[in-house]
């Protein structure tokens, strides 16, 4: 019913990751979690993101900082923007989500918290080790797993798929495969779309 394409390197994705779970629980539908590399999307079809980071519009940048703080307060999440390391290389973390499969949600949540709430560099093996230990994952098979070619290929395939389906960033959310939404602030529309879909089942 709901597909959630995500990269933990985005604060807006952290908000959406947090907010979509109670929405899905309320409506009795499942979320299919699809890890991606948002940098791969930017490199392929949305390179203007890099230009806007290099030469931001001051007024817009100030407002975006306020907007993020407002959403974080409303959601009850601690988000430091920008983190000390930004942008961050999230490839190992996102491969970890792929490797964990149906068990990825606690790991993804811990990665979001480590990066956005605790200002830890999630590109570092030491941080990933700590995150694994915190939630009861053995680091040794974790690091072996994320090095497997099949895991690397699946992460790339997820990223290529969301682009092919019209996505341009993270989070990209689909209801019933074709109805696409982008961003945390689309939750009311996603809720309406799911309700309409349930009516027509």
Predicted region positions:
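C-terminal cap of thioredoxin/glutaredoxin-like
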Residues: 2-3, 8-30, 102, 106, ...
